[in-house]
Amino acid sequence: MILSDKDIFDYVNSKRVLIEPFNSKFVGPCSYDVTLGSEFIKYKDDVYDLKKNLSHNKFEIENSIMVCPLNHHLDETIIENYKEKYNVDCVVSGGLLGTTNEYVELPNDVCAQYQGRSSFGRVFLQTHQTAGWIDSGFKGKITLEIVAYDKPVILYKNQRVGQLIFSKTLSPADIGYSDRKCSKYAGQKSVMASLIKKDFEIDEEE
């Protein structure tokens, strides 16, 4: 059962669902809009070896970032020209990780799904790849996987980037996501790189 606007207000007001900060203007008919934070991660590895720690740079923006497609040629001169012409803090090509401003806590009988905004899809910008599912009992900020597929796109800190759709489960989970020992991203309050390496460690322990 998907929560309507009335349900979302009820769950937030009764503190069964926590959204911090909460803006009543961001409540839709059956969703809640979330906004872009200031922290990002850009991977440095030429190859993603998923059994190893992934090398990356973590950085912050003051106002805006230009996201270019992977095959978009960038060099120092082009980057500086883009920064000056479009007044952006940072210019990157390829995929990068971002995070929402919003910190969310779900009870064990509510799960959620993140969806990118249709307006972004219409300029061929995706803000999540496969990680749109949020398990019951999750606590933390939502990580975004950002890719531009056509032309460079300028994103602004604090702009609405997607929405959360909340669903009531038939029964509460016995162990919520953030209470499971093997949950890798429980309580995340900042952008986090992939911890898939830990999957292999868990398998070896078993």
UniProtKB/Swiss-Prot annotation:
Enzyme Commission identifier(s): 3.5.4.30
Key words of the record: Hydrolase, Nucleotide metabolism, Nucleotide-binding
Single GO MF descriptor: nucleotide binding
Subunit annotation: Homotrimer.
HAMAP family noted in UniProt: dCTP_deaminase (MF_00146)
Pathway field: Pyrimidine metabolism; dUMP biosynthesis; dUMP from dCTP: step 1/1
Gene Ontology biological-process annotations: dUMP biosynthetic process; dUTP biosynthetic process
Residues that hold dCTP according to the record: 117-122, 135, 143-145, 163, 177, 184, 188
Protein family membership: Belongs to the dCTP deaminase family.
Catalytic residue positions: 145 (proton donor/acceptor)
Site (Important for bifunctional activity): 132-133
Protein name in UniProt: dCTP deaminase, dUMP-forming
Catalytic activity reported: dCTP + 2 H2O = dUMP + NH4(+) + diphosphate
Function noted in UniProt: Bifunctional enzyme that catalyzes both the deamination of dCTP to dUTP and the hydrolysis of dUTP to dUMP without releasing the toxic dUTP intermediate.
Pfam families tied to this protein: DCD (PF22769)
InterPro entries: dCTP_deaminase, dUTPase-like_sf, dUTPase_trimeric
